A protein has these predicted regions:
Chain B
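Short acidic, glycine/serine/threonine-rich loops at helix termini
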Residues: 81-85, 121-124, 195, 217, ...
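Flexible, low-hydrophobicity surface segments
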Residues: 1-159, 182-185, 260, 467
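Thiamine diphosphate
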Residues: 246, 250-272, 276-278, 506-514
Length: 308, 786, 164
């Protein structure tokens, strides 16, 4: 993916007041293969248009101005699914937020998705916005990136003649930057299922629909009362893809509340929040700790089958 | 015709007549106006807060195949239109000539075939700026080294606009000197924005042949605007027609004349075609009339027993780059001097200093009733600070100080004469509805467990319904409004008004006023408004003035018609007028009720052939221009419950009880709607709304992603009730309600939040109380947002 | 390019630029001005229409993308002179003041009731939480939707029931 959107800074630095995108050429993809073909043909000035809620607002503010838009709305059936297969949940990249929110499978096996979707954007946006679009926009405050990182999701990226799978650490290169290259597209997200895995998401926002002030996702796998795997990922606070020190503090130990609190402290200490209108850096760091602790508590309770 | 509960003939709950078109999507808003050959305008705005304009190159924009014209300040200078007068006797740039003075200021106007090309063309205009340091903090605007913003004004050597005082400083100082207790508190009413869902705009259509300009415009005051255009543009006033079609919310945002309107007019003259200009949301938030921005230092003096003796306040008023506020000429700080509140005090004094800053012009907007929001916030927060200092329950403290009914009409220490009030009754009602004692018990229990629950009390008195022409004018136009009533031969009627509804339901409520006076059913009365060619002159709708002023005019016009009807009826029934008695809808012979004439029958006769006494003209029409003898003083008692998460400091409004007294109630359903809307404003301002700036003057609140407005999930189910204390000087005893809840709710919610944080020893926290700012307060680090 | 969109069960074809947003297509090309716009950042929701029965923000949708879907605007709520219960509800319960957010609110209400004929107050508030009203304070909107839930339209008669 070549044309990058410049960061939508909170300083709202815009030259001109506009409401409509700059002109572009338009093509409708009929299949994934066709979309990849078009991407290759049209080159780096082409962008994929999925739900539109990440890209079109940027274009309306003239922060992004691709020359070509490849509309993949027609791929919603090909790439819109949530299914269990080979011990994994597989989610098509065009799956809408609403479908994720309403998925029985996710609610029972990976409720971190359900928790997050409840507080992502608003119900109208959730009808159209897609997981692929959200992940590929890679806004640092974006929730599904943290969710996928916490559960150790694998990203399936397809090119013209090749398909590769990468973890979140490789997928998330930085703000607004992913591993999806030119003439490639994200097609699927895969998460390993484990009956002993519990997960949860917590978020503080100034108002419903706002980007997170701070958010934390946790996924904990237990075996014989001991943590065998822990995934902790924060959104909106300049954290690493996952909070490694916090995760390491948990693995191999019994998840007592003191231990969870300690992990939360590590996570909070390791992030780099910025002060802005959403909150001071100090506040965000404080809440990172609070929410990590809450998310870990609920993840553990769910792993133990003690909470819906 | 019998009045029923569902279809009252007169006051009562009735469904709105205007709904029929809105629920079908057939409202006619300015952007819905499409005229043949219409072109579209877009404004190029300054990206910086303060800079000299070095050059403007429009050549590339003019090359765009769909662009018809590009207008700059230089072009307007030739027409003497580069600057225009503001509603405060200042001047404002229509398009910048020498400098830009706030981020978002208008620099050039492009006219193109369609709205997309107009915006494309903006990017083709090249402006070179020489950036200057910006004045962003109003507290520093008068520093010796502050850059002078208005160097365009002769004799302006600093950023000072005005000083204004009210009350008796000496008496107040004396009261404070001998007081048992004095509490002082700095507080900020931060900059917010009315942000109606429909932005501002206009369609200008200059007919070259007739010389008549028709201007569809989002204006709350079409007649006043017409006069302003006549003065500014040198167009004869009878050749200007301003039409406010349906307006998607005003809230004071649509009172000023904006540069975009003037550009649209010039554009139509220049191109010979209709020109539409509709701003987008960022323009609305960054350049149109903001609200509030008062930096206040308050003080309250009292006895140890909690008897308030004095209130004083010094204010720095941030007016932005041009003084464009709308308020009566004699009152540059609006009605702020009603900060004396609802209490019986011995002395009061305020001083307001207005300053220029490199920010958008404005200040009076967002249902402030001309700064009454600021005044009520100040006094209600100070009373709570006093309660905190004395350790007295805030409701109890208010009960000890509220004005008593026998004190009305009450002349307060800054000169207002409050018309009527029975305050204690209203406060006790609110306390009973919410279960105040029970809530305090619950709070004590929750506090014991570390939970943060807060109960906030607020009591307000507004001063609305401007106003008496002797005291109140805007740009020399007295604030009187008219009403014209025509009753047709078949007994149907048309009422033409000068006020301008933006959702307040005038098409229904004003018909109800006529119905109450004459007994003509509201569905038989058509209310006409918004077209200056067909309606009487007036100053428009804002400051809750429609019911107090035009409502009075309407009732009086209806009474004139009724008096005329009596004479016609006496001719019809061949009795003397004194032998007739009125019951709603008919005059009948005293003692012989079967013998009478309905208003409809009288209407036909009035237009007919019946012989009328000498000097009595035919027809049943009547008109009035109403000069109010005084303002009206709606009041209310509000109580709010909040819960604050001790770890994340997130505030949730759990309950809100509002008991309002707006005097005589015309339509309870509409009154309730007005209150609900205002309470939501309170949640917005108290918790999330802020037009913020960085130190370079970049506006950080320029989109609805940054400027947060409450959704349905932030608002509880509002609990409202009322008391009725009619205004003795108003023909129907009504006081107005439009802004009451916006005035009363912010301090009530802040009082609740501060109350919740009592365990942390918090005395005050400035709005907006976002989680981060509340958390700062809990750490002992409360600070104003700007 | 030519774009054909089905709106309120009728097809409309116009020649427009690819970047034309559905909201402008509806308002400026087709004169269906019941759908409004109020912001630049997909926040206000005054542009909400139904696409395949679900609320979407037409300011964040290309007209070209809407092709191949079924769009319903406020103009499509009233059928053969019969108001939709949500339209009646908004009038009964004072669910509107200036009317600007109303078309979007009513369409979202319609979609909600089609999925969930008896929503709670909380569910209604959640459903409209992506749309801002500056006038009503939302409580009367909730009541309006509840009214519509309690007064659903009479079901259309089946073909057997319609007498010749």
């Amino acid at each position: 993916m070549s044309a990058r959107a410049r960061a939508l800074t909170l300083g709202f630095e815009r030259k001109d007041p506009v409401q409509v995108p700059a002109p572009f050429e338009y093509a409708r993809a009929t299949s994934v293969d066709n979309a990849l073909e078009l991407l290759q043909q049209l080159g780096p000035e082409a962008r994929l248009l999925a739900g539109g809620y990440s890209l079109l607002p940027m274009m309306k503010l003239r922060l992004a101005a691709p020359e070509y838009l490849i509309d993949i709305d027609g791929l919603a059936s090909e790439l819109g699914y949530i299914r269990e297969s080979d011990g994994e949940v597989r989610i098509g990249a065009m799956t809408r937020h609403r479908e994720l929110l309403e998925s029985e499978l996710l609610a029972t096996r990976l409720p971190i998705f359900t928790d997050a979707e409840r507080v992502i954007a608003d119900p109208v946006v959730r009808n159209r916005g897609t997981i692929g679009g959200a992940l590929c926009q890679a806004d640092p405050a974006e929730d599904l990136s943290a969710v996928c990182a916490a559960v150790g999701a694998q990203m399936v990226i397809r090119g013209r003649n090749v398909e590769r799978t990468v973890g979140m650490r490789e997928f998330q290169r930085g703000p607004y930057e992913t591993a999806v290259g030119e003439a490639e597209m994200l097609v699927e997200i895969r998460v390993a299922l484990d009956p002993n895995l519990g997960s949860a998401y917590e978020k503080v926002e100034r108002r419903v629909g706002d980007w997170a002030v701070t958010a934390a996702g946790a996924a904990v796998t237990l075996s014989g009362g001991i943590v065998t795997r822990a995934g902790i990922a924060l959104a909106a606070v300049g954290a690493e893809v996952t909070s490694v020190e916090a995760e390491n503090a948990l693995v191999g130990k019994a998840p007592t509340d003191e231990l969870l609190a300690e992990a939360a402290r590590f996570a909070a200490a390791a992030c780099s929040p910025a002060s802005d209108q959403r909150g001071s850096a100090e506040y965000k760091r404080h809440v990172a700790g609070v929410l990590t602790h809450r998310a870990l508590r609920r993840a553990v309770a769910r792993a133990l089958g003690r909470e819906a | 015709m019998a009045t029923t509960e569902e279809r009252p003939i007169g006051f009562g709950r009735m469904k709105r007549k205007e709904d029929a078109r809105f629920i079908r999507g057939q409202g006619n808003y300015v952007d819905d106006v499409q005229l043949p050959g219409m072109l579209h305008g877009a404004i190029l705005r300054s990206p910086v807060a303060h800079a000299r304009i070095v050059s403007i190159d429009t050549s590339a924009a003019l090359q765009h195949p769909k662009v018809h014209a590009v207008i700059t300040g230089k072009d307007l200078e030739g027409l003497n239109l580069a600057w225009m007068p503001t509603l405060s006797y200042d001047t404002q740039a229509v398009l910048a000539t020498d400098k830009v003075r706030f981020q978002g200021q208008e620099v050039a106007f492009v006219i193109a075939d369609d709205r997309y090309s107009a915006r494309d063309a903006l990017e083709l205009i090249d402006v070179e700026y020489d950036t200057l340091p910006a004045v962003v903090n109003a507290r520093k605007a008068l520093d010796a080294d502050a850059p002078v913003i208005r160097d365009d004004k002769e004799n302006q050597t600093d950023n000072h606009i005005f000083d204004w005082e009210s009350g008796d400083r000496a008496a107040t100082d004396e009261v404070f000197a001998r007081a048992d207790v004095v509490v002082e508190q700095d507080m900020l009413y931060p900059r917010s924005h009315p942000a109606p869902m429909e932005t501002c705009g206009a369609v200008a259509d200059m007919d070259k042949v007739s010389g008549k300009l028709t201007l569809w415009c989002t204006t709350q005051a079409p007649h006043a605007h017409r006069t302003v255009y006549a003065l500014v543009a040198g167009l004869p006033e009878h050749k200007i027609r301003v039409i406010s079609p349906d307006i998607g919310g005003g809230f004071g945002n649509k009172v000023p004349v904006y540069p975009g309107y003037v550009c649209a007019v010039v554009g139509s003259i220049v191109t010979g075609k209709p020109v539409k200009w509709m701003e987008d949301r960022s323009e609305n938030l960054m350049s149109t009339g903001f609200a509030r921005d008062y930096v206040m230092k308050g003080g309250i003096a009292a006895t140890r027993e909690g008897k308030i003796t004095g209130i004083r306040v010094d204010v720095i008023a941030d007016h932005g780059a041009f003084n464009a506020t709308a308020q009566p000429t004699k009152y540059p700080a609006g009605f702020f001097h009603v900060f004396t509140g609802s209490y019986d005090i011995e002395a009061a004094h305020c001083k307001v200093t207005g300053v220029y800053t490199n920010k958008a012009p404005g200040g009076v907007a967002y249902a402030c009733s001309f700064r009454v929001t600021e005044a009520v916030y100040l006094v209600e927060r100070m009373v709570d600070c006093l309660a905190d200092e004395l350790g007295i329950d805030p409701a109890e403290l208010r009960l000890r100080n509220l004005l008593r009914p026998d004190q009305f009409p009450y002349e307060c220490k800054t000169g207002w004469v409050y018309d009527s009030g029975d305050y204690e009754r209203t406060l006790r009602k609110a306390m009973e509805i919410i279960g105040y004692e029970q809530l305090r018990r619950e709070q004590a229990e929750l506090r014991g467990r570390g939970a943060l629950m807060g109960i906030g009390v607020g009591f307000f008195t507004e001063a609305v319904g401007a106003g008496p022409r002797k005291h109140m004018d805007i740009l020399g136009l007295g604030m009187n409004d008219g009403a014209e009533l025509r009753i047709h031969p078949t007994g149907k009627a048309q009422l033409s008004l000068s006020v301008q509804t933006q959702g307040q339901g005038h098409e229904t409520t004003f018909a109800q006023i006529v119905a109450e006076e004459l007994g003509i059913p509201p569905e038989d009365i058509d209310v006409v408004h918004g077209d200056t060619d067909t309606t009487p002159y007036g100053l428009g709708t804002y400051g809750s003035r429609s019911t107090p002023v035009s409502g009075a005019a309407t009732a009086l016009a209806a009474r004139k018609a009724r008096d005329k009807a009596r004479i016609v009826a006496s001719a019809m029934l061949e009795v003397a007028p004194d032998d007739l008695e009125w019951e709603k809808g008919r005059w009948f012979v005293k003692g012989d009720p079967e013998k009478g004439a309905t208003i409809q029958e009288i209407a036909m006769a009035a237009h007919g052939v019946i012989e009328l006494p000498a000097g009595v003209e035919g027809g049943l029409d009547a008109e009035t221009v109403y000069d109010p003898p005084n303002l009206t003083f709606p009041f209310g008692a509000y109580i709010c419950v909040v819960d604050v998460d001790p770890d994340t400091a997130k505030v949730k409004v759990r309950r809100f009880v509002a008991v309002d007294d707006c005097g005589t109630r015309i339509n309870p359903m509409i009154i309730e709607g007005q209150v609900h809307g205002g309470l939501t404003d309170g949640v917005g301002m108290a918790l999330m709304e802020l037009i913020a700036f960085d130190e370079d003057g970049n506006c950080l609140g320029g989109s609805l992603m940054d400027y947060l407005i409450p959704t349905a999930l932030e608002c509880p189910d509002w609990e409202t009730d009322h008391t009725v204390t009619p205004s003795p000087h108003h023909p129907i005893g009504a006081k107005g309600i439009g802004e009451s809840a916006t005035v009363g709710s912010p301090p009530t919610i802040v009082n609740a939040i501060v109350d919740a944080l009592k365990p942390y020893g918090v005395r005050h926290i400035d709005m907006p109380c976002t989680p981060s700012r509340v958390w700062d307060a809990m750490q002992g680090k409360a600070a104003p947002p700007q | 390019m030519q774009v054909t969109v089905s709106i309120n069960d009728q097809e409309y074809t116009r020649d427009v630029e690819p970047r034309m947003l559905l909201v402008h297509f509806l308002r400026d090309e087709l004169g269906l001005t019941g759908t409004h716009w109020g912001c630049d950042t997909s926040n206000c929701g005054t542009c909400v229409v139904l696409m395949d029965g679900e609320p979407v923000k037409s300011c964040t949708l290309l007209a070209a993308t809407a092709a191949g879907h079924e769009i319903k605007t406020v103009e499509g709520l009233e059928v053969d002179g019969v108001l939709d219960p949500v339209q009646q509800g908004f009038t009964e319960m004072h669910g509107l003041q200036c009317g600007f957010c109303t078309p979007g609110m009513m369409l979202t209400a319609r979609a909600l009731l089609d999925r969930n004929p008896n929503p709670t107050e909380e569910e209604i508030r959640e459903a409209i939480s992506g749309q801002i009203c500056r006038c009503t304070g939302y409580a009367t909107i909730v009541r309006s939707v509840r009214w519509a839930a309690e007064h659903p339209a009479a079901p259309a008669p089946s073909s057997e029931e319609v007498t010749a």
